[in-house]
Amino acid sequence: MKLMKMTLAIMFAFMMLAANVVCEAAAETVDNGAELARVKRLAIGYPDYYKTLEKEPTTDEFIKAIFDASKVARTYIISYDDMATHIKQDTGIDIKVIPKMDARRIFKEQVYKYADAYLIVTLANNSRVTMFCDVYAVNTNERVYSLQIPGNKSDDSKNFKSYKTLAEEFFRTFDRAAQAEAKKEAKNNKD
């Protein structure tokens, strides 16, 4: 009887853990006609990120965490710093020093020269960190792909390493979505 109760308790704990994991899975949206398989170069745009704790990374460190995470990507990733350099060479405007709204507008106007799509990361930095990764087509500036990645609930997770880990999950998931679309296109072309 004691063994049965222990077994039931373990099963219940496992079910609760599994339910918790399922509820906290990333939410992915691929828009119709996204053409993710055609994205060979993805530029990182300026993120929507604001520190809520003193020990959190600065915006520049957050951008670096995103770019460092891109090493797991199969797609060629263009850093925000490289985009700023290219735009400054082409237009004479340094998007890193002008007001953010102007910088975003100029980025959107110029990004088509260097990339097939661009990524804007938004970090909801409340009691639980949630990273929203939105990919936009350069020709229309319309969102074609979105991924919501929940993080941990503790303030200890608001650091460079945690943000990099969340961004790595984005790049892996984006690559899988692009591969799935490519396979689907190949299958449709065979038929």
Segments the model singles out, each with a brief description of its role:
Residues 117-119:
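Well-ordered beta-strand positions
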Residues 52-102:
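N-terminal segment of the mature soluble domain
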Residues 38-52, 87-90:
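Acidic/histidine-rich, surface-exposed loop or edge segments in extracytoplasmic proteins
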Residues 1-11:
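Bacterial N-terminal signal peptides that target proteins for export
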Residues 104-114:
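Short, well-structured alpha-helical segments in soluble
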Residues 23-43, 63, 72, 112-113, ...:
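C-terminal/domain-edge helix-coil "capping" segments
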Residues 48-54, 121-128:
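Short, flexible beta-strand-to-coil junctions
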